[in-house]
UniProtKB/Swiss-Prot annotation:
Residues with glycosylation annotation: 207, 348
Pfam families according to UniProt: Trehalase (PF01204)
Gene3D superfamilies: 1.50.10.10
Entry's Gene Ontology BP terms: trehalose catabolic process
Keyword Repeat attached: no
Tissues expressed in: Expressed by the venom gland.
EC number: 3.2.1.28
PROSITE patterns (alphabetical): TREHALASE_1 (PS00927), TREHALASE_2 (PS00928)
GO terms, molecular function: alpha,alpha-trehalase activity
Ligand binding (substrate): 184, 191-192, 228, 237-239, 302-304, 336, 550
Any GO CC annotation of this UniProt entry: extracellular region
UniProt-recorded name of the protein: Trehalase
Length: 585
């Protein structure tokens, strides 16, 4: 298993990965196209307990726990060699067919779960942050203050004992405290943390934000990328690349240029990982573009959802096809959208099932927009630091991705950008909030901003988004998957609202305000009724938590609270209902 202490030496495979990334970034500064496609590298975790092998398979298929994540979040009371030896002894004694009671007893004797991740009180937490005074409505101000108290409830730190025996744990040891989403998610997650950090910085928690960034930067140094979350079983995949915008947020609030100077090389490595591991050549109208998709090289079910993945794949007889299926499930998890009809390719478009998942064959709008913004930000960072050669290099990459976004993803007929189907060489003309992501990342010709804003607003209206009082749904297809209708997710609300605002076009800004206020009111209604904030909501029933997926709805909730703060910052005069006068702001 990969060592997880800060001082642990990287494996030969990890060193090779880091060299590849470094070479990709420094080998040729002459052309943005110099970073080519390579075969995605395989898992960094080979643990027989947490990542792959007969022990993991037997426990998870034995249904010792209803939620498979529960098992892989346990730590071992002995070294892995003892854990595995005891398992082999059990298998020998039971003829390779232990029953559920025997497996439960084995887990009880060899694993524990307490005190691995411990509560933490952020020293920079403030009881009455200055931001609260900006919120004009007293009801919303009280709510915002309540959510500020939640930071203390969902703050964690990895226990010191983990660093003493990292091989016994699935948790990845990091030096600084962090914010967990809440509920079953008791480790840090990558893309969640962007919206969490928005909330932290608005409530004055600059040091906590810096610590979270340092944790992520240490992941890039140790593994070459940021895993999906803070567990070794997530080392098979990343998540949407938001580290560079997180640093930009931090710099906006602190002006800490020394932090940027110290870490600019690590930010380059993270972008290099995506540009070298996630790209593919896309040909349209006789021209070839380098574009990104979510893709994972990792066989077998996801450890934390082993049973669900195994059942889905059991009727696939061809081993190569089964591996592809598992990899596309993991790639969908890497996207953050696990799962959604967005990743289905079938004769009926998205109207299939998970058996039709084809994540690697879809060029997602937001991933390419994120990468364009990342390259653009790195160019700006290097300009600020006085590195003109590097600034030009990343500006060229940003220009290359901008051209691809314009030429491949833009749909003139729809007035937005659409995912591209590699298998059938065509746009996927279905509604997803990410269809306006280039407006969110400002990955567009600024001279056309108002045109794009007007067309995006018209597109959203045409697709009936104003009919959903509980938030903008992830799609318009009710599949039962959690990233489909009727679920409305906080980050997608942020993307749509800020996309419309970025256009500076009147109809777009009016719609942005309407959608943001609806979201605030729906969230507040749910909070008033339950005293909880949820990870997702029901677009059809304002304030009701969302459903579907592989686990029950989770409370907390990190990114939900962050988006509330974002919207209250954008619209400080917002009110809980229409009976209270609200000025434009």
């Amino acid at each position: 298993m990969a060592k997880t202490t800060p001082m642990a030496k990287p494996s030969v495979g990890l060193l090779t990965l880091q060299v590849l990334v470094f070479c990709a970034l420094t080998g040729s500064l002459a052309s943005a196209g110099s970073i080519g496609h390579v075969t995605p590298r395989s898992d960094l975790c080979d643990s027989e307990v947490y990542c792959q092998g007969e022990l993991l398979k037997t426990i998870q298929l034995g249904e010792v726990f209803k939620d498979g994540k529960t098992f892989v979040d346990h730590y071992q009371v002995n070294d892995p060699s003892v854990t595995v030896a005891n398992f082999r002894k059990l298998m020998a004694e039971t003829g390779g067919k232990p029953n559920k009671d025997q497996l439960t007893q084995y887990v009880k004797e060899n694993f524990a779960q307490e005190n691995e991740v411990i509560d933490w009180s952020p020293p920079d937490w403030q009881e009455n942050p200055e931001f609260l005074q900006r919120v004009q409505d007293p009801v919303f101000r009280k709510w915002a203050k309540d959510l500020n108290d939640v930071w203390k409830i969902i703050s964690r730190k990895v226990a010191p004992s983990v660093a003493e025996h990292p091989e016994r744990h699935s948790i990845i040891s990091v030096d600084n405290g962090f914010i967990v989403p809440g509920g079953r998610f008791q480790e840090f997650y990558y893309w969640d943390s962007y919206w969490v950090m928005e909330g932290l910085l608005l409530t004055g928690m600059k040091n906590t934000s810096r610590g979270i960034l340092e944790n992520f930067l240490s992941m890039v140094t140790r593994f070459g990328f940021i895993p999906n979350g803070g567990r070794v079983y997530y080392l098979m995949r990343s998540q949407p690349p938001l580290l560079i915008p997180m640093v930009d947020l931090y710099l906006t609030h602190t002006g800490d240029m020394q932090f940027l100077r110290d870490n600019i090389g690590t930010l380059e490595k993270e972008l290099g990982y995506f540009l070298s591991q996630k790209t593919v050549d896309v040909t349209k109208n006789g021209k070839t573009y380098k574009m990104a998709r979510y893709i994972v090289s990792s066989n077998g079910p996801r450890p934390e959802s082993y049973r669900e993945d195994y059942e889905l794949a059991k009727n696939i007889n061809d081993e190569a096809e089964k591996r592809r299926f598992y990899e596309d499930l993991k790639a969908a998890a890497e996207s953050g959208w696990d799962f959604s009809s967005r990743w289905y390719i079938s004769e009926n478009g998205t109207r299939g099932s998970l058996s039709n998942i084809a994540t690697r064959n879809i060029i997602p709008v937001e991933l390419n927009a994120f990468l364009q913004r990342n390259a653009r930000m790195l160019a700006q960072f290097h300009t600020t630091l006085g590195n003109p050669t590097k600034a030009k290099y990343y500006k060229d990459i940003a220009t290359s991705y901008q051209q691809a976004i314009d030429d491949v993803l833009w749909s003139e007929s729809e007035g937005v950008w659409l995912d591209f189907d590699l298998r059938n060489s065509q746009h996927r003309n279905y509604f997803f909030p990410t269809n306006v992501a280039p407006l969110y990342t400002q990955s567009f010709d600024s001279s056309k901003a108002q045109i794009y804003g007007q067309r995006a607003a018209a597109y959203l209206t045409r697709n009936g988004i104003l009919d959903y009082m509980g938030g903008t749904p992830a799609s318009l297809f009710p599949t039962g998957e959690q990233w489909d209708l009727p679920n409305a997710w906080p980050p997608l609300q942020s993307i749509i609202v800020q996309a419309l605002r970025n256009s500076n076009e009147e109809s777009a800004e009016k719609l942005a305000k309407e959608l943001a206020i609806r979201w605030l009111r729906a969230n507040h209604k749910g909070y008033s009724q339950s005293g909880q904030m949820f990870e997702k909501y029901d677009a059809l029933n304002p304030g009701k938590f969302g459903g579907g997926g592989e686990y029950v709805v989770q409370e907390g909730f990190g990114w939900t609270n962050g988006v509330v703060y974002e919207f209250l910052n954008s619209y400080p005069n917002a009110t809980p209902d229409d009976n209270v006068h609200m000025n434009n702001n």
